[in-house]
Design a protein with these regions (language model features):
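Hydrophobic or amphipathic, alpha-helical segments that drive membrane association/targeting
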Residues: 2-7, 12, 17-18, 22-117, ...
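Extracytoplasmic and endomembrane cell-envelope/extracellular-matrix remodeling and assembly machinery
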Residues: 39-40, 55, 67, 75, ...
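Active-site His/Glu-centered metal-binding helix of metallohydrolases
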Residues: 57, 144-156, 219
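Envelope-exposed proteins and targeting segments
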Residues: 73, 100-104, 112, 120-124, ...
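Short pre-active-site segment immediately N-terminal to the catalytic Zn-binding motif
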Residues: 114, 125-142, 206-211
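Catalytic Zn2+-binding segment of zinc metalloproteases
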Residues: 135-139, 148-165, 183
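Acidic/histidine metal-binding catalytic segments
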Residues: 160-172, 189-192, 228-238
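Membrane-active amphipathic alpha-helices enriched in small hydrophobic residues
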Residues: 168-183, 192-200
Length: 560
């Protein structure tokens, strides 16, 4: 029988408890049980077992406050990830079994370090620091494409084949290091874990072989090119990281510790970039990326010092192009909202609207004028001089949407009913997830402000969220907002059920079962909503069965 991963993880915990920081109790990591992973004759971790392992890791990670669901940033992340995933499918990099059984789910981590990491089961962690540091959407796609290729090429499972016993210890140490990194957010702790476990890991990442790194580079760059991103993004990112690591050795780049840059990797990326076709600048989302970099910076470090620095930068009258200026204003406004300094936030949003209007006028003027180059004569020789005016590209429509959403955040922060209503109106008929969540937050804000229209807004939010969760039952934030909107309407049973579903979506089955039992108790008191009551009974049975099945898996893991 091959050693079970749970046993090795428990042994690793005992060996590693010396390195746990005081703020994080040792027992918090000693309780990590992992599913059984099959027999010794298996050549590698099966896809089913890989998904089980990934699900168990995510059950430990999701409840941590460092894992955030910011609808605006997450939608931007998915706007890069989804084309990469689709391109990998088209190229045949993802087998039908992988596509069906793996999660293909990225998640955001509130951490200023430049890092992204692939996990078993098709999960991918993305630090806000990576988004903030990426100079373009293409550079961001290069990192995600690289990590996606670690998943599609099954590098974790293949690494375990090389030396089964040692790789299991490595994986156990990896999981402990990952959990300690996310929960303690102390870079020294996971490195101590890595050393003691003899795992080539950094903040939750496997250090893959040079061959696998080269493979992930090549597959990742091909995938990002097929997805419509500029292949030069990977070479540009490598150059940016090379310069940064040379000038700054402050451990802010853990991705480099587990993905060491070599001359060969950089040269290969540059060669592939030269062979690819240049991207149309109109499709590069330059301004939207500037806004999302600023949002990542504001959310990854919410200290007063960091936020006031962003606020001050937005007030500086320095020459910037429109994309940079809009990014700076967006970051300054968001920082002001976080500081509850609403007057500067409103002023910065208004200035951004002026910049957008002026830019649109310039684009329109350019379109009206002849596209032919201006020809003039040289003063001395009379020879013709061709003057080509640089083309000005229209700002992406997503930018106006992002500022409209920011205006809603600012109005909700003020808790002014009329201002909230005016801000929500700027969203128009936007049915995206960020707009849906913003309307729900606005309805809750109206209720807090005792706005007379709050009841109608809450009911509309409940109906919209109920439709959304029917199609997206794993959306924790949507369930949470549904509970918060239903409660003030007196829909107690619906609110309790939504709270339970939020717990279940996070993997907290005990918490979900507890809330559903509270719902059953409420129905026995005579406050009946027969539809919700029947759903609660059914879901309670389902989750109890799921918990029993999970318990059997963990029992098998502990008793090989």
């Amino acid at each position: 029988m091959r050693p079970k991963l749970a046993t090795l993880a428990a042994a690793a915990c005992l060996a590693l408890n010396l390195f746990v920081v005081p703020a994080t109790p040792a027992h918090a990591f000693g309780q990590l049980n992992l599913p059984a992973l099959g027999e010794a004759e298996s050549d590698q971790l099966s896809i089913d077992d890989e998904r089980k392992l990934g699900d168990q890791i995510m059950r430990e990670i999701r409840p941590d406050p460092a894992v955030i669901d910011d609808p605006v940033l997450y939608q931007y992340l998915m706007s890069v990830f989804v084309p990469l995933h689709e391109a990998a499918l088209r190229r045949g990099n993802i087998s039908p079994e992988q596509e069906e059984k793996l999660a293909w789910e990225p998640f955001l981590v509130r951490d200023p370090e430049f890092n992204a990491f692939a996990l078993p089961g098709g999960f991918m962690g993305v630090n806000l620091g990576m988004i903030a540091a990426a100079g373009s959407r293409d550079e961001m796609a290069s990192v995600l494409g690289h990590e996606l290729s670690h998943i599609t090429q099954r590098h974790i499972a293949r690494s375990m084949v090389v030396n089964k016993h040692q790789s299991m210890i490595t994986m156990a140490a990896m999981l402990i290091g990952l959990l300690m990194s996310v929960k303690a957010r102390n870079g020294d702790v996971p490195m101590a874990v890595i050393t003691s476990g003899q795992a080539a890991m950094a903040t939750g990442q496997l250090t893959f072989s040079r061959q696998m790194e080269a493979e992930a580079d090549a597959f990742g760059q091909d995938v990002m090119t097929d997805a419509g991103f500029a292949p030069s993004g990977m070479a540009a990112m490598f150059g940016r990281l090379e310069d940064a690591s040379r000038l700054n050795d402050s451990n802010q780049y853990p991705w480099l510790r587990s993905h060491p840059l070599t001359i060969e990797r950089i040269a290969a990326a540059r060669l592939r970039a030269r062979q690819g076709a240049p991207q149309d600048p109109a499709k590069s989302h330059i301004t939207e990326h500037a806004l999302m970099r600023a949002r990542a910076r504001a959310l990854m470090d919410t200290s007063d010092v960091a936020l006031r620095r962003m606020q001050a930068q937005a007030r500086l009258n320095v020459p910037l192009n429109d994309a940079e200026r809009l990014g700076t204003l967006y970051g300054g406004a968001l920082a002001s909202i976080e500081l509850r300094d609403f007057a500067p936030a409103a002023a910065m949003i208004a200035e951004a609207e002026t910049v957008q209007a002026q830019h649109a006028a310039l684009v329109e003027q350019q379109a009206r004028e002849a596209t032919a180059p201006v020809v003039s004569a040289h003063e001395a020789t009379g020879a013709p001089i061709v003057v080509v005016t640089p083309r000005v590209y229209a700002i992406e429509p997503e930018v106006a949407r992002d500022f409209a959403l920011l205006r809603v955040e600012e109005a909700v922060g003020r808790r002014s009913g009329p201002e909230i209503s005016a801000a929500v109106a700027t969203l128009g008929d936007d049915r995206s997830r960020p707009a849906l969540m913003a309307r729900a937050e606005a309805a809750i804000g109206r209720a807090a402000a005792r706005d007379p229209s709050a009841g109608a807004s809450l009911q509309m939010a409940v109906e919209s969220l109920q439709t959304w969760v029917a199609e997206h039952p794993r959306d924790v934030l949507a369930w949470t907002l549904l509970a918060q909107c239903a409660e003030p309407l007196g829909q107690k049973l619906r609110a309790i059920r939504a709270e339970a579903e939020a717990h279940a979506a996070q993997g907290d089955l005990l918490g979900a079962i507890d809330r559903l039992r509270a719902g059953q108790k409420l129905t026995r008191s005579g406050r009946l909503d027969f539809v919700e009551a029947s759903i609660i009974d059914s879901r309670l049975r389902e989750l109890q069965a799921e918990r029993r099945a999970l318990g059997r898996d963990l029992h098998d893991a502990d008793h090989p």
